[in-house]
């Protein structure tokens, strides 16, 4: 009887919570650049950033501002196919695309793009960059060919050698920092745990693959 009453109580409370949610469908008719959403991120100012296969969108609850690549405009994003989004400690928005990385200064409305090693920014070549800003303010870029750490003073990237783990050849699906500052990386080869200095703690193999955290 106690179990049944508890279950009913929990179910009723859950139903009441659900009733308090309001849902709204947002489409291209509302200003979204494309209907296939790849990633969503909320910044410190409350803006919702939406990455699609056809451009980047910033939403302020009322309207969208679109960011698209323009080969004739240096103040445009590196590509329209968006992979991931994060915000650094200075409030700049970083966006990874299949072509490069983009940094957006929303206060000045300035954009700077970073490409692979051929552009002298030391960014390892990849078309699936994943981004993470740690609690200490480090900007880490995970790619298929390795890991990069952003050097703010030099405005460039340093390649991090990760020994005895499978990140250097893995496809990275997701990454997350825990309360201890450890970084968990989900890959097609399993789960990898790193310390805050990106040293390997442990690898967890997955026979199925495509681990997300």
Over which residues does each language-model region extend?
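Carboxylate-rich, polar loop motifs that coordinate divalent cations or form catalytic acidic clusters
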Residues: 1-213
